[in-house]
């Protein structure tokens, strides 16, 4: 919606022309349908989409609109009805049985693996384990001393578990309840807010246990270590799919996947084929993430640098 607002702020501009000439890429053909790519509220998702936007606009000449979507349900319903075209990073462990039904009926198409592998989990800085080695595994978090160590003014007698965005796929409240841990979940609200809290805690050498994931630049920067939770089981995975509240294990390793509207292949077959071939590996993400996640560089600029450096990679996605 932003392009429509800009001409109003600059009366001398030509309102009708501005959206088609969006700064992005030269060679966009405004007569082609707009491709609506979904971005989720975490850094790697943004970078994936910016890379795709850059290449689609400059080589396939479709205008691309990036739409922020925070909830899986809205993401799947949008692709199913054709109002959204594709998402490039889905974590399968967070897909419910109800959402899988969209794949089953064909209204949403599974268009292959992204190429990166992710893992959500509980993380603490190494200095926390150096002082409290029992916290390397979940059993240490059942002890009353853990509640004291991680307690804050807001959490009272309970320890604070720092979560991030409430819209993320997460089972931490269930894990805490089902494993009888004296903790409560508090949400920072966003990935940057969690980084800010982690930075403050680390600078002061204060304990923090948090929801986090790989690949991210913060793991290396803050020397984060993953806590060993109970092993993933089929029963636990079934509980996640059914949303029955019984989750009591670690998060599984996620081979990240892509999905598209069932209508996209007809709408833009060349874009559909490109997105099927589109591949961003874990190493690719880790190459881009520090500049965006840590340094705060513009994600479109970070993506453009990656595109400029890797034409040998992405040119094969167009063939």
Give the ranges of each region predicted by the language model:
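Immediate post-signal peptide segment of exported/extracytoplasmic ligand-binding proteins
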Residues: 2-36, 150-158, 312-319
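Short, polar/charged alpha-helical segment
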Residues: 22-26, 43-62, 174-176
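Short, well-ordered beta-strand elements
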Residues: 29-44, 62-68, 158-162, 275
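An extracytoplasmic/periplasmic, membrane-proximal ligand-sensing/linker region
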Residues: 32, 44, 168-184, 188-205, ...
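N-terminal segment of the mature folded domain
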Residues: 72-127
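Ligand-binding pocket segment of bilobal, Venus flytrap-like solute-binding proteins
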Residues: 76-78, 84-91, 160-238
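A conserved helix-loop-strand patch within extracytoplasmic ligand-binding domains
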Residues: 107-161
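A bilobed periplasmic-binding-protein/Venus flytrap-type ligand-binding module shared by bacterial periplasmic
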Residues: 119-130, 254-267, 288-291
């Amino acid at each position: 919606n932003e392009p429509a607002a800009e001409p109003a702020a600059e009366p001398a501009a030509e309102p009708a022309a501005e959206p088609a000439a969006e700064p992005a890429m030269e060679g966009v053909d405004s007569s082609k349908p707009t491709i609506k790519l979904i971005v989720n509220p975490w850094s790697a998702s943004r970078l994936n989409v910016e890379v795709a936007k850059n290449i689609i606009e400059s080589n396939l000449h479709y205008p691309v609109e990036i739409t922020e979507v925070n909830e899986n349900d809205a993401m799947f319903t949008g692709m199913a009805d054709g109002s959204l075209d594709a998402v490039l990073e889905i974590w399968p462990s967070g897909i419910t049985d109800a959402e899988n039904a969209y794949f089953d009926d064909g209204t949403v198409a599974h268009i292959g693996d992204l190429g990166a592998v992710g893992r959500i989990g509980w993380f603490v800085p190494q200095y926390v384990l150096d002082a409290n080695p029992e916290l390397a595994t979940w059993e240490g978090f059942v002890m009353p001393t853990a509640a004291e160590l991680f307690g804050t003014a807001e959490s009272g007698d309970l320890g604070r578990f720092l979560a991030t965005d409430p819209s993320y796929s997460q089972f931490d409240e269930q894990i805490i309840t089902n494993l009888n841990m004296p903790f409560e979940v508090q949400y920072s609200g966003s990935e940057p807010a969690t980084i800010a809290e982690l930075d403050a805690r680390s600078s002061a050498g204060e304990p923090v246990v948090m929801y986090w994931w790989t690949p991210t630049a913060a793991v290396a920067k803050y020397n984060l270590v993953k806590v060993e939770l109970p092993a993933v089981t089929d029963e636990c995975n079934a509980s996640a799919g059914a949303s029955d509240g019984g989750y009591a294990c670690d998060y599984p390793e996620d081979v990240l996947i892509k999905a598209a509207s069932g209508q996209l292949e007809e709408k833009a077959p060349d874009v559909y084929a490109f997105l099927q071939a589109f591949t961003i590996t874990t190493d690719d993400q880790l190459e881009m993430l520090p500049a965006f996640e840590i340094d705060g560089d513009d994600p479109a600029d970070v993506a453009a640098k990656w595109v400029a450096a890797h034409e040998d990679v992405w040119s094969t996605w167009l063939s």
